Amino acid sequence: MIGVGILKGMGVTARNFVGSYFEKDRLTTVQYPEERSPLPENYRNFPILIYDTDDPNAGLRCVACKICEKECPPQCIYIIKSEDKKPDYMGKPQFYPAVFDIDISVCMSCQICVEVCPFEAIKMDKDFELSKRERFDALLTRKGELSKSNEYYHRIHPIEAAEVDAKLAEAAAAAAAKKKAA
């Protein structure tokens, strides 16, 4: 019989259509933007810069080593290192990025920049609502827009953020013990 497969498929569709009216768990759509689907822990969109203090410029973890810029496959990261040094979030004088831009129109969200960063300064964001009023405003994201607090990072990736903070605290304790021993 030629139409048996079509009838079986239509039966499955009708069963799911009718069943979704009686069982709320079977609904797959949500009323966006009032309701939002939960994003998984490992969801990633575009890179952000993490800072640890109240001031995004003073607490930025990035020391402008340019490893992420060199390793980026589409070469969408643009960094200019500062001429002077400022104390970082741990009080150690470090260089900082005078300019840190990411061309979002070129970025392919591969997360290589996150993997190669030795300072845990660049992470992937979960924000996917990137619309702007002007056509070209969303293409190039500057340091001010990329900078997000460590608290924000804890909200979007709680497990990974706790691991990173524990590793950074351990490194700070080891550095303090080494300084005390010397």
Each language-model region and where it sits:
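Non-ligating segments of multi-cofactor redox enzymes
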Residues: M1-V106, E115, E120, M124-A182
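Basic, alpha-helical nucleic-acid-binding regions used in initiation and control of genome expression
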Residues: C110
